[in-house]
UniProtKB/Swiss-Prot annotation:
It is found in: Membrane. The chain crosses the membrane at residues 2-22, 93-113, 116-136. It comes from Schizosaccharomyces pombe (strain 972 / ATCC 24843) (Fission yeast). Keywords: Membrane, Transmembrane, Transmembrane helix. Its main location: membrane. It is a multi-pass membrane protein. This is Putative uncharacterized transmembrane protein C16E9.20. It comes from the Eukaryota. GO terms for cellular component: membrane.
Length: 189
């Protein structure tokens, strides 16, 4: 029991740190997306104003200007897609490390407390449920919303992530802690 008491605080601090990092990453991703949208609208309005102020020229000159505008728009849009995709990939990696850390926490607690499991049979599930179930359910709900909404449909290399079944990640927890796994499966359905 002393080992558990000495082990749980640093791991709990790491879990809390990752939780705040995920919140910060979500805020940064939202800011970048809104900034890209604002820049796109601003550049589009500038382009419209410049076209209104220009005098009418020859037809050939107009076609060249249109082609140039299309090339700039395509280049900027492809660059914006790349930035957005990189942010999503980094955010997914952060989610993955957060999941691995929490899973390691549960496995460590299970193997350390296994000799005493018959003694604290009624207290250990209550401890797990009260202290970590809310964090895990919020993590899986955030992960589900990330894969369903943030991953853009035009990204072909990220399209398989949209069909990811989160129940496969919960199966180790279902085997170790049925009361936790059942609640997590209900939240990920």
């Amino acid at each position: 029991m002393l080992v558990v008491v000495s082990l749980t605080p640093p791991v709990g601090v790491c879990v809390g740190l990752f939780h705040h990092l995920l919140s910060l990453g979500g805020g940064i991703t939202t800011c970048i997306t809104s900034m890209e949208t604002g820049i796109t609208k601003w550049s589009g309005s500038l382009r419209c104003n410049s076209q209104m102020q220009k005098e009418k020229g020859e037809r050939k000159g107009k076609e060249e200007e249109r082609k140039r505008g299309k090339e700039e728009k395509i280049w900027f849009h492809s660059k914006k897609m790349k930035i957005h995709d990189y942010c999503i990939v980094l955010y997914c990696i952060l989610f993955y490390f957060y999941f691995v850390l929490i899973l390691f926490y549960f496995i460590a607690l299970y193997f350390i407390l296994h000799p005493f499991y018959s003694t604290i049979l009624f207290f250990f599930p209550l401890f797990i449920k009260c202290s970590h179930l809310h964090t895990l359910t919020s993590f899986y709900s955030l992960l589900s919303s990330l894969f369903s909404s943030l991953i853009p449909k035009h990204s072909l290399h990220l399209a398989p992530l949209r069909k990811l079944n989160l129940s496969h990640f919960v199966s180790p927890l279902c085997a170790m802690f049925p009361h936790v796994g059942l609640r997590l499966l209900q939240t990920t359905q």
